[in-house]
Design a protein with these regions (language model features):
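Acidic/Ser-Thr/Pro-Gly-rich, low-complexity N-terminal segments
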Residues: 514-517, 523, 533, 538
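Flavin-dependent oxidoreductase catalytic core characteristic
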Residues: 2-506, 511, 521, 528, ...
Length: 539
């Protein structure tokens, strides 16, 4: 993918690995896969979710600044509603990705190994990263399709498939891992039922299983009644904290969590071990769990910061988006439930008639959220916290941020200039090519001479127009250099055939008195010394 990510097959011939180089020593031989899976829940909670969050922050910061500086028809494109539709999820996704990331690494800090949260976090954050980068490319448009040192999105765009694929491909994580594992590991009764069924003492196991099973049935009935009552009441029967005007969201989350719990129980009881083959159902249930998790993470993130009021539009956008996604995922699971006879009862329990009206954020809230990454406010700084920022005109990101600052500082001057140009006769301006790239100085001199711009405003205006033109330019390369680069790249790439499989070495006989194997004790230093000696022509 033309990205610095070392990934591929590894093989060797007569490779010797000293025992001291084996993780865990001799006791852990043959247990590498187990150790890998145990560590995966930790690494998967940190690396790729952080990558997705960072990419989302960068995309929102740079694209919001670019949208402000890019003008069309005499207006910033950030004022166009079509562009705002792309800027809106950029800001919202960056906010909720960061909230979910912090919630999950907080579990790691407490010594928890969150296998299910890490799986859904990796899946969702990398998926939102893909959406964010695609939205950013839509806004940047032609400015983003030429790869080169000026392009601040190309590398992130190229790296998206890697993040989607590694550490558990998203398509399998969604359809198999998140709900398939979570439904069993997180259920209050399933694990105990399995343990009772495996009990070597059949009498004791049957007695334990009966007690747990009846508790499971009562749990399912309670979930059904709770889902029905909360569904009809719109969650109003649930006691919720009265903080920061979030009561409606708490109630909807309580209502849908009851529906999710009921649907989980019914799925396990009716589908059982066939859940692995019902990957569409498992995927929709995973989407429901993801929406519940991210909505909870957003509320906690805002709470931990003390409910700053300027973040409320972003919080509401994230909650409304996740609740709408949660509703759609649960409805899809109910409408396509693999046992047709249960579809109508589940629909009445989870979605009482006339009590489902969630449609996601409206246009008014969307415009406010889009402005969060366009306007120079503390909210924009908070959203981009931790993101590398500079205003170096020779840097791909710094070029955009420098033009953004100069454009904001001279906005009133440029508005005055544009208004004067619109009022002038075309014949008067016929000798001036109003192209910022070619005759900026002539245009500024004309504006100063006409009294439109003062002498003190000349240099700031010229600097801003220069930066605004420079941020629009794409990279241009000499054809001969491109040809040499292509030939060099082609020459460095060579298809390597996989080595033929070798016969496994015969296992040595153990010593009869100890049962251990006769293994020559060697160290890495000894092997290095022997290798160097073999290459010494004088040896």
């Amino acid at each position: 993918m033309n990205t610095v990510f070392m990934n591929g097959p590894t093989w060797g011939t007569e490779v010797f690995i000293p025992m001291e180089q084996v993780i865990g020593g001799q006791d852990m031989l043959g247990k590498g896969w187990k150790m890998l899976l145990e560590c995966l829940s930790i690494g998967r909670s940190i690396s790729l979710p952080a990558l997705g969050t960072g990419a989302g922050k960068l995309a929102s910061l740079a694209t919001g600044a670019y949208a402000y500086t890019r003008e069309q028809f005499g207006r910033s494109i950030s004022e166009f509603e079509g562009v705002q539709e792309a800027l809106e999820p950029l800001a919202g996704h960056a906010y909720q990705m960061n909230a979910a990331r912090l919630l999950t690494v907080g579990m790691l800090d407490r010594g928890v190994r969150p296998s299910v949260p890490s799986a859904l976090l990796k899946y969702r954050n990398t998926d939102l990263m893909r959406r964010a980068i695609n939205h950013a490319m839509d806004v940047v448009a032609g400015r983003g399709v030429i790869t080169g040192p000026r392009n601040f999105l190309a590398r992130a765009y190229q790296a998206v498939p890697i993040a989607i694929t590694v550490e558990g491909a998203n398509i399998l994580t969604r359809s198999l891992m998140v709900f398939g594992q979570g439904a069993i590991r997180c259920h209050p009764y399933i694990t105990r039922e399995i343990e009772a069924a495996r009990d070597s003492d059949s009498v004791r196991g049957a007695r334990a299983f009966d007690g747990v099973f009846y508790g499971h049935m009562a749990h399912t009935v309670r979930n059904g009644l709770r889902a029905l009552l909360l569904g009809y009441a719109g969650g109003r029967l649930e006691r919720v904290p009265f903080k920061a005007d979030l009561e409606p969201y708490y109630r909807q989350l309580a209502r849908f969590s009851a529906g999710f719990a009921l649907l989980t129980d019914v799925t396990l009881l009716s589908v059982g071990g066939g859940l692995k083959a019902r990957q569409r159902l498992s995927g929709r249930m995973a989407d429901s769990l993801v929406a519940l998790y991210y909505a909870s993470a957003v509320i906690k993130f805002w709470h931990d910061q003390g409910y700053p009021p300027e973040q409320k539009p972003l919080v509401e956008w994230c909650l409304q988006r996740n609740l709408a996604d949660l509703q759609d995922a649960l409805r899809g699971a109910v409408d396509n439930f693999p046992v047709p006879a249960l579809r109508r009862p589940l629909r009445w329990l989870v979605f009482p008639p006339g009590h489902t009206r969630l449609s996601g954020p409206d246009d008014t809230l969307g415009r406010t959220v889009a402005a969060a990454i366009v306007e120079d406010t503390p909210l924009r700084d908070a959203l981009a916290a931790g993101c590398y920022r500079n205003e170096n005109p020779d840097d791909s990101l710094g070029r955009v941020l420098n033009a953004y600052r100069l454009a904001r500082e001279t906005a009133h001057i440029r508005d005055r200039l544009h208004a004067a140009i619109r009022k002038r006769d075309e014949d008067e301006l016929d000798g001036i090519a109003l192209l910022m790239g070619h005759q900026r100085a002539e245009l500024v001199n004309w504006a100063v001479g006409e009294g439109i711009v003062s002498e003190e405003e000349r240099e700031p205006l010229l600097a801003a127009l220069t930066a605004l033109y420079d941020v629009l330019r794409v990279d241009a390369f000499d054809p001969s250099g491109l040809r040499e680069l292509a030939q060099a790249a082609k020459g460095k790439r060579r298809v390597v055939e996989r080595p033929a499989p070798q016969e496994p070495l015969e296992e040595p006989e153990p010593y009869p008195e100890t049962g251990s194997y006769a293994v020559e004790e060697r160290t890495a230093d000894a092997d290095i010394a022997e290798d160097e000696e073999s290459r010494d022509p004088t040896a």
